[in-house]
Every structure is written in structure tokens, then in C-alpha cells.
């Protein structure tokens, strides 16, 4: 089935506190992930919260990559949504690896076609 896009949603657990709380590290990781997947970057916006946590988005021509971190729990939620022929798992795998996730639960949603079919991807 052809779709307009693929949306990978990952729950990352057991990540390093310092990495999850480092806005520069998170931003570089997301920019690198987008480029590794072959995406064209349009905008980048990240915010550091007090006392901890980072949220951000990389807008790509093909859609977006987002993150919300909770360093105090060793947890990050990430979304990688791509349209066209880009594979969002390339970016999602790279991000999980860079954050050192000990546990990862992922689902993939085909977007733009009905009905919605949730595909459970993988758990580390």
C-alpha cells in the first residue's frame, strides 16, 4: 500500500541524564539524524527547560522530527514523520543510539491513507 508518509513514534528509556539535558547535543543529534535520512532541513527550534529537559523540532521538507526529554526519568519521546521515499527508521534508529536508550518501544503509522493501520516496529 502506498502512503503519503510514514510516522515513527518511539519511547526511549534508560537514556543518559546528561545527554537528555544537553540542548546542544540534542539539537546536533536531530540535525544529523535528519541529514542521515536524506532529508532537507528547513527550520530548527529547541528549548531548554528549568530545572531540566529539552523539547525541539527539526522541520524538514518531507515533514518533521520532534523530541521531548525527561532526564529525571531517563526518558525521551521522539517522532520522525517523513513523506515520500525517505525512511524514518534511519533517523529514529540513529537518535535512539546516540541517546544510549536501553529500552525502546516503537510504532509506525502509515499517514495519508485510510484506514489507519498501526504497525508495532521493535522493542530493544
UniProtKB/Swiss-Prot annotation:
Its EC number is 4.1.1.50. One of its GO terms (cellular component) is cytosol. The active site is at residues 63, 68, 83. One of its GO terms (molecular function) is adenosylmethionine decarboxylase activity. Its cofactor is pyruvate. Gene3D superfamilies: 3.30.160.750, S-adenosylmethionine decarboxylase domain. Keywords: Autocatalytic cleavage, Decarboxylase, Lyase, Polyamine biosynthesis, Pyruvate, S-adenosyl-L-methionine, Schiff base, Spermidine biosynthesis, Zymogen. It catalyses: S-adenosyl-L-methionine + H(+) = S-adenosyl 3-(methylsulfanyl)propylamine + CO2. The modification Pyruvic acid (Ser) is found at residue 63. The keyword Mitochondrion does not apply. Pfam families: AdoMet_dc (PF02675). InterPro entries: AdoMetDC_C, AdoMetDC_fam_prok, AdoMetDC_N, S-AdoMet_deCO2ase_core, S-AdoMet_deCOase_pro-enz. Heterotetramer of two alpha and two beta chains arranged as a dimer of alpha/beta heterodimers. HAMAP family: AdoMetDC_1. This is S-adenosylmethionine decarboxylase proenzyme. It comes from Geobacillus sp. (strain WCH70). The lineage of its organism: Bacteria, Bacillati, Bacillota, Bacilli, Bacillales. The gene is speH.
